[in-house]
Each structure stands twice: as structure tokens, then as C-alpha cells.
Amino acid sequence: MPKLQLSELLSLNKVEQILRLAEINTELEQLTAQERVSWALDNLEGKPAVSSSFGIQAAVMLQLVTDVKSDTPVILTDTGYLFPETYQFIDTLTERLNLNLQVFTADETPMWQEARYGKLWEQGVDGLKHYNRLNKVQPMRRALDQLQVGVWFSGLRRDQSSSRSHLPILSIQNGVFKFLPVIDWSNQEVHYYLEEKGLPYHPLRDEGYLSVGDTHTTQKWEPGMKEEDTRFFGLKRECGLHEDDAEAEGSGI
């Protein structure tokens, strides 16, 4: 069976493209996460990579993908403002899973950014958009280009936020296949998988964090909060990585 080519899908009109992707996603919904990863590597044209923020449950996706293809590049967009525990977690998982870690950063250092723009995360939604564009979106775009990625794996899940609740397993984003093998997993399924494989959570989970990003835009969970409320002061959920560029530059995350 020939591999599914991005150019083939993009040559279809919008309706045909939607129908073709829907047909494939219907089939993928019947597979396990492990089977989905194998299917993607066998059937999608292009070099694979997996992005990771090394958050609370990051070990799941990293193990799933590298268990099938051990040399898959793992892309980290490092803002320079991660928790010390996150950097330690990165080292732990990189050594334990023998990860092919590829770190990308903004063109401007954190100190240059603060000198030029002030503390963007304190400047409302527009400031957060600017910050995320500099530190997450642009470095990721560069990573996909430099690594010549054709299949981008990510560990997004529908129950993490309302903005992710209708995401498909397979889509096209910014000119590459986007593939979400655990999109329909619950927190319980994640927990069982980590236990089964003997994999760790991020160390800050034990201190009350449900989601971990930068130190200045992450807070502990408190009663009455949704998981998405613990990031970006509750103003937004996404950092911009998981949207098409046109959308990110327009209505936002």
C-alpha cells in the first residue's frame, strides 16, 4: 500500500479533503494508541518527530512513539522560563528513554525580550500572544523546517480543555501531517499506562500542579478550577503551537 502523500490530500478541493480525512479518522478511532502510532509511521509520507513540553504526563507520548521508532526526534521549544523541576525531568526522561532530544529556542534570549518588550506575560492576551509567538510558535516552525518533518506527533487529549474537545487524530497543520494518538484517552487511561510501563509523572504533580509550562504563567490547581484555568491566568489555554499559522496570527490561540 503506497504511503498517504500530503500533496495528494492538498490537491483535493476542501470538501473532498475533509471527507477523505474523516474517512481515515473513522478507521483510526477503532485502533489502540500503539496501533495508531504504527499506522502513522507505516502509512504517512515524511519524516516523523514528536513535540513535547515535558509536562505532567509527557512520558506517555515519548514512550509510545520511541518504542516503535527509537530515533524519532523529540522537539522541545525551550522558553528559558521552565521550572527547574522541568529541566530535571527532561534530563531524567532523555536518559531513561534514550531520547533523540532536539532543543529549539527563540532568536532573542529571555533577557533581550524583557529589555525590548517588557514582561509580555503581564500584558494581557495580546502580550501572551506575542510571547508565545516568539518563544513557542516560531521556534517550532524552525524545528519542523530544519528537521524536515512530515509527520508531527503530539500528546494532546480532548479532555484537557474545551479547545481540544473536537480535535481529530489525523489532520494537516502548517504543511505537515499532525497526528494525535492519545487524543481520546482519559486521565485514568494515562495513569494506567504510566503505571504499566513504570514511567514517572512530572515531579510537580505531587505539589498540586495539573499542567506545567513556564514559571510565570503556571499555577497550582485550586478547588473549583478546571485544568485549563491553571495556565495563562485562565485567559487562554493554548500556546499557539497547535494551530495553523494563519489562525495564530489572527483570532488567537
From Swiss-Prot:
Membrane-spanning segments: none
Molecular function per GO: phosphoadenylyl-sulfate reductase (thioredoxin) activity
Catalytic center residues: 239 (nucleophile)
EC number: 1.8.4.8
Pathway: Sulfur metabolism; hydrogen sulfide biosynthesis; sulfite from sulfate: step 3/3
Catalyzed reactions per annotation: [thioredoxin]-disulfide + sulfite + adenosine 3',5'-bisphosphate + 2 H(+) = [thioredoxin]-dithiol + 3'-phosphoadenylyl sulfate
Gene Ontology BP term (one): hydrogen sulfide biosynthetic process
A GO cellular component annotation in the UniProt record: cytoplasm
Family the UniProt entry places it in: Belongs to the PAPS reductase family. CysH subfamily.
NCBIfam families (alphabetical): cysH (TIGR00434), PAPS_reductase (TIGR02057), PRK02090.1 (NF002537)
Entry protein name: Phosphoadenosine 5'-phosphosulfate reductase
Phylogenetic lineage: Bacteria, Pseudomonadati, Pseudomonadota, Gammaproteobacteria, Vibrionales
